[in-house]
């Protein structure tokens, strides 16, 4: 992928949780790099083998950057756009006018799986349960799981904090149903498949997991299902055994295992895992290319 030399700003750099590391591995052609955040000025972040001091977002001159990746603080997007800076919105929030959005990993994961099911037969509806690694919440999620785990083993009081509604260490914390329902509604409309979705945070640093079941209007065979999943781009169907979130780390493929069809052929289920940080970085890179090409 060919790109010009970039003056790149990353907003919310302390929320990156592996994104900066993965982006640096892609060796973007950079003329300048500006890590930006609020209230973290002077802290250091690692990028491209070097440590960079975090700059205060409020004081930044947007005319010095060609393109900005927003991981947080999207209220500053308008200022960046007004200064002529291209913007990639990787915050996972509501789409911002003028910015190129990065789709949430859970949306991409579900889209690939439902695409495979639709290739196998007439999908009437689907039900899924997603288990989200703490890196979904950026560095704050990773730090909170680490802190709470240490406190438990040291028999100290565990501070819940604000990142999660309840303790995350050795626990499973459901995502607010309104948020999960909003994702399901948006995906159902896009893919034309009614979808019921539950999401939960789990005490895993990296790697999202998803259990999904689809109901068909007519019977499908195991062979048809296997062919559909094998032929769907972005999916690696494990020939045997079970895929864990750890197996997917380092790649952008959705690993699928435990593919099964009911006796009547009218329903099928699958287990899927993906490296959320790696896939987010690659999706961000694609959005970055789109932003640079946009006029």
Positions of predicted regions on the chain:
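A generic structural signal for beta-strand entry/edge sites
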Residues: 209, 265-267
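Flexible, small-/acidic-enriched active-site or ligand-binding loops
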Residues: 276-282, 286-292
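Contiguous C-terminal substrate-recognition/catalytic subdomains in enzyme active sites
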Residues: 61, 159-249
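Glycine-rich phosphate/pyrophosphate-binding beta-alpha loops
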Residues: 201-203, 274-278
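Hydrophobic side chains in beta-strands
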Residues: 130, 174, 214, 258-259, ...
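N-terminal Rossmann-like NAD(P) cofactor-binding subdomain of oxidoreductases
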Residues: 2-166, 192-194, 218, 222, ...
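A structural motif
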Residues: 128, 212-213, 284
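Short, well-ordered beta-strand elements
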Residues: 268-274
């Amino acid at each position: 992928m060919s790109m010009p030399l970039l003056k790149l700003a990353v907003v919310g750099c302390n929320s990156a949780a592996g994104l900066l590391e993965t982006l640096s591995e892609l060796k973007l052609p950079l003329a300048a790099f500006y890590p930006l955040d609020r209230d973290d000025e002077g802290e250091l972040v690692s990028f491209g083998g070097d440590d960079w001091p975090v700059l205060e977002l409020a004081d930044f001159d947007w005319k010095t950057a060609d393109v900005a990746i927003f991981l947080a603080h999207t209220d500053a997007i308008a200022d960046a756009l007004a200064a002529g800076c291209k913007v990639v919105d990787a915050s996972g929030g509501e789409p911002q006018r003028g910015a190129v959005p990065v789709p949430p990993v859970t949306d991409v994961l579900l889209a690939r799986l439902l695409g495979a099911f639709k290739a196998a037969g007439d999908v009437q509806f689907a039900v899924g349960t997603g288990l989200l690694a703490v890196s979904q919440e950026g560095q704050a999620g990773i730090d909170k799981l680490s802190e709470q785990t240490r406190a438990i083993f040291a028999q100290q009081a565990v501070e819940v904090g604000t990142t999660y509604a309840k303790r995350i260490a050795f626990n499973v914390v459901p995502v607010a149903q309104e948020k999960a329902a909003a994702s399901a509604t948006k995906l159902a409309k896009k893919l034309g498949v009614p979808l019921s979705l539950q999401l939960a945070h789990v005490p895993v640093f990296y790697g999202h997991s998803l259990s999904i079941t689809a109901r068909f209007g007519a019977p499908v065979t195991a062979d048809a299902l296997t062919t559909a999943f094998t032929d769907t781009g972005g999916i690696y169907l494990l020939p045997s055994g079970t895929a864990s979130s750890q197996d997917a780390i380092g790649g952008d493929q959705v690993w699928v295992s435990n593919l099964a069809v009911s006796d009547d052929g009218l329903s099928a289920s699958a287990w899927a895992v993906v490296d959320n940080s790696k896939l987010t970085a690659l999706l961000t890179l694609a959005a970055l290319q789109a932003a640079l090409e946009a006029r």
